[in-house]
A protein has these predicted regions:
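Helix-to-loop junction immediately C-terminal to a conserved catalytic motif
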Residues: 58
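Conserved ABC transporter NBD signature motif
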Residues: 66-77
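Short coil-to-helix segment of the ABC ATPase nucleotide-binding domain corresponding to the Q-loop/switch region
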Residues: 104-113
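Conserved ABC ATPase signature
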Residues: 144-154
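Hydrophobic anchor residue at the start of the ABC signature
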Residues: 158
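A short, proline-enriched helix->beta-strand linker immediately N-terminal to the Walker B motif
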Residues: 163-167
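Catalytic Walker B motif of ABC-type/P-loop ATPase nucleotide-binding domains
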Residues: 169-172
Length: 231
């Protein structure tokens, strides 16, 4: 594995929102290289564009201008089929809200990406059992979300995001609704999957103590990313 491999690169990314009263430029020129197995935290006050930036990295939103490269290939935003393939094969998303399907069991929620991707049922189950074991969720596989704690529900969301073995995990305030102990458990999972599965992680967080567990910390301020010393 080449840990110097660039997974994604942002070049002069700008994002403007247009309103009847005028326009608001949230991102004013973001430049960032993300390498294989990086652990990156993006911090900053509410409303500065952290989620917008994460969504642009994940191709859930588009920049007003600038270029994004995945695996040294420039993204073409007019090619939705290729963007969808990129998301499915390489990117896992985790949000502050877990978005689990309440009528589904833990096992059914985790296997959903495989079923959507038309995997065989036996392959879906095999993969799900592997992830359940790794995240210590095996005993809860037939539970529905309402029976789980907040931390357990977020662990299921992580398991679902890991199902298709992504290259990159994008996490938007994944511990925002959790107590301190649950937040630590969830953070430990991120660190383990980074180390054991070589998955690159970009996390938006308000929690400075969690941010310090990452290799690189960037402050989003006034539309620009500023790299901070991790001390």
């Amino acid at each position: 594995m080449n840990e110097n491999k660039v997974i994604v690169e942002l070049k002069d990314i700008k994002k403007r929102y247009f309103y009847p009263q005028g326009e608001l430029e949230v991102l004013k020129g973001i430049n960032l290289k993300v390498y294989k197995k990086d652990k990156i935290a993006i911090v900053g006050p509410s409303g500065v564009g952290k989620t917008t930036l994460l969504n642009i990295i994940g191709t859930l939103d588009y920049p007003t201008s600038g270029e994004i490269y995945y695996f040294e290939k420039k993204l073409d935003y007019s090619d939705e089929e290729t963007l969808l393939k990129l998301r499915k094969e390489n990117i896992g998303f985790i949000f502050q809200l877990h978005y689990l399907i309440p009528e589904f069991t833990v096992l059914e929620n985790i296997t959903l990406p495989g079923l959507i991707s038309q995997w065989k049922k036996e392959d879906c189950l095999k993969r799900a059992y592997e992830i359940l074991e790794k995240l210590n969720l095996s005993e809860k596989k037939y539970y529905k979300p309402f029976r789980l704690s907040g931390g357990e529900r977020q662990k299921v969301a992580i398991a679902r995001a890991l199902f298709l073995n992504p290259t990159l995990l994008l996490a938007d305030e994944p511990t925002g609704n959790l107590d301190q102990e649950s937040a630590k458990e969830v953070m430990d999972i991120f660190l383990r999957v980074n180390e054991e599965l070589n998955i690159t992680i970009i996390m938006v967080t308000h929690n400075w103590e969690l941010a310090k567990k990452m290799d690189k910390i960037f402050l989003l301020k006034s539309g620009f990313l500023v790299k901070l010393e991790n001390t």
